[in-house]
Amino acid sequence: MGKGRAPCCDKTKVKRGPWSHDEDLKLISFIHKNGHENWRSLPKQAGLLRCGKSCRLRWINYLRPDVKRGNFSAEEEDTIIKLHQSFGNKWSKIASKLPGRTDNEIKNVWHTHLKKRLSSETNLNADEAGSKGSLNEEENSQESSPNASMSFAGSNISSKDDDAQISQMFEHILTYSEFTGMLQEVDKPELLEMPFDLDPDIWSFIDGSDSFQQPENRALQESEEDEVDKWFKHLESELGLEENDNQQQQQQHKQGTEDEHSSSLLESYELLIH
């Protein structure tokens, strides 16, 4: 491995700590006469028991004539913030863009003041963004609620329209059914009303036409009826019912003659009275 850069001085033989007024005067007078081309050899040439790095920092940060004293202005702070976004913690580059300001001062003002201010501003912006987002959500909800009510009202109106359409459909169906019923009544064949005072010969003619159309069936039916009558007469003769029927017929005939005789007597009597 390489040894690296050699130290500028022996740390055991140099003085540390704050600078005295005499040390500041020696450094200022030497730089005004000889300049500061080589900081490594400057302490020995100026008669200072200090390190070259310590002399450089003392001159740059405190003793040079163009060093600004006091607080940083608002413009300087904004410049430091912008440069820090570009260069980061490279304080020497930032100091080169700000004449009269040292890198040590810039670093101190950044850590003590500007960094805290940026963090507070970012938190404030985040809070504002959250509040704006909540306001936008509330506005959207308020806008959506009238739309929802409008949609609900529209649904009610549409349901009412649907009910009206359904009722109209039912009415149309009923009227159509009534109309079809009327058409069926019109299309029914008219029944001929037969007069009650028809000539009895018509019915005999109809019966005759039936008998003419079916002579064989009529003859077969009459033969069957004759057979049934013969069978009933045979049964009455076997049971003795035929004699009883003859006696009843004779009694009825006798009673009828008696009634006719009595009625004729009454009529003659009435004629005599009158």
Curated annotation (Swiss-Prot):
Pfam families recorded for this chain? Myb_DNA-binding
Which positions, given as ranges, span the membrane?
none
| Domain of life of the organism encoding this protein | Eukaryota
Induction trigger? Slightly induced by light. Regulated by the SND1 close homologs NST1, NST2, VND6, and VND7 and their downstream targets MYB46 and MYB83.
| Assigned keywords, A-Z | Activator, DNA-binding, Lignin biosynthesis, Nucleus, Repeat, Transcription, Transcription regulation
Upon gene disruption, the observed phenotype is:
Reduction in secondary wall thickening and lignin content.
Transmembrane helix in keyword set: no
A GO molecular function held by the record: transcription cis-regulatory region binding
Give the function comment from the record.
Answer: Transcriptional activator that binds DNA to the AC cis-elements 5'-ACCTACC-3', 5'-ACCAACC-3' and 5'-ACCTAAC-3' of promoters and specifically activates lignin biosynthetic genes during secondary wall formation mediated by SND1.
- Give the protein name, as stated in the record: Transcription factor MYB58
Organism per entry: Arabidopsis thaliana (Mouse-ear cress)
What's the name of its gene?
Answer: MYB58
